[in-house]
């Protein structure tokens, strides 16, 4: 299928890259929606293996941010976990010649219509149960939502999960929210700690057994695409929200 050419979205305001676990970095940036005109935060996770860097849930960085990223190592791979993310993946592929990995069944469409005809990027790898991932200690936990989503499970630091839209940890709004998002998103159920993503749950309709199956994973830390990192006892902190899914 021919790709629809489009310019890379610009770098939007973001914070500093910070190491939340040895070899695992986290940076909070911005996403901007047109209708309704909401602006709120999103996170990128940077996982280091030797001198290689794997970016998960990409957020485009500004010039200073890219210099800080380059100081950490060489970007070789980009991993997309949530179908609602990925708009900055083409930028990192072009800049670093990075290999792009997505969950099988996802497509790069503009906006939130996963079934739209036009796509703006084709991945290098569509990840399934038997896919050898770009991190030697990683595996994928796939959720059969529509479109599908996955968790990246790292066998390090007593188990570390990187999440897309399914698990969120917005205990409060932050500096990247505009006034409308500060008003609307609490009412919509987003601003809660240790939360199952409410819009994702409603729109993507994951099987409850797949969501509850997350509790069968062994992890102490959770790095979400939205909200603060949870370092220590993460599975138990998310247990109540996951068990409420029906």
Model-derived segments and their meaning:
Residues 1-64, 115-185, 209-216:
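Catalytic core of the metallo-beta-lactamase
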Residues 15, 21-22, 34, 59-60, ...:
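Cap/insert and terminal regions of metallo-dependent hydrolase folds
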Residues 26-29, 71, 193:
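Generic signal for short, ordered secondary-structure residues
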Residues 47, 67-69, 189-191:
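A short alpha-helix capping/helix-coil boundary motif
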Residues 50-53, 70-76, 219:
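Short, surface-exposed connector motifs at secondary-structure boundaries
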Residues 56-59, 79-83, 103-104, 143, ...:
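Short His-Asn-centered micro-motif
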Residues 66-132:
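Active-site HxH/HxHxD metal-binding segment of metal-dependent hydrolases
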Residues 87-88, 109-112, 147-149, 169-172, ...:
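Short, well-ordered, mixed-charge alpha-helical segments that flank or form enzyme active sites
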């Amino acid at each position: 299928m021919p790709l629809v050419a489009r310019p890379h979205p610009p770098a939007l305001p973001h914070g500093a890259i910070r190491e939340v676990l040895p070899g695992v970095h986290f940076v909070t940036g911005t996403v901007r929606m047109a209708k309704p005109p909401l602006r709120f935060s999103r996170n990128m996770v940077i996982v280091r293996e030797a001198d290689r860097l794997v970016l998960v849930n990409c957020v485009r960085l500004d010039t200073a941010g890219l210099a800080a990223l380059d100081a950490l190592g060489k970007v070789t791979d980009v991993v997309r976990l949530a179908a609602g993310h990925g708009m900055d993946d083409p930028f990192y592929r072009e800049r670093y010649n990075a290999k792009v990995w997505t969950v099988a069944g996802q497509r790069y469409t503009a906006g939130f219509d996963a079934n739209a005809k036009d796509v703006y990027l084709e991945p290098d790898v569509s990840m399934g149960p038997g896919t050898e991932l770009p991190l030697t200690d990683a595996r994928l936990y796939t959720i059969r939502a529509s479109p599908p989503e996955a968790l990246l499970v790292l066998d390090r630091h007593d188990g570390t999960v990187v999440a897309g839209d399914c698990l969120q940890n917005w205990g409060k709004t932050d500096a990247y929210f505009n006034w409308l998002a500060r008003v609307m998103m609490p009412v919509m159920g987003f601003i809660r700690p240790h939360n199952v993503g409410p819009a994702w749950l409603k729109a993507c309709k994951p099987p409850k057994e797949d969501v509850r199956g997350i509790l069968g994973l062994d992890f102490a830390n959770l790095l979400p695409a939205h909200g603060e990192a949870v370092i220590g006892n993460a599975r138990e902190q998310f247990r109540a929200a996951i068990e409420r899914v029906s």
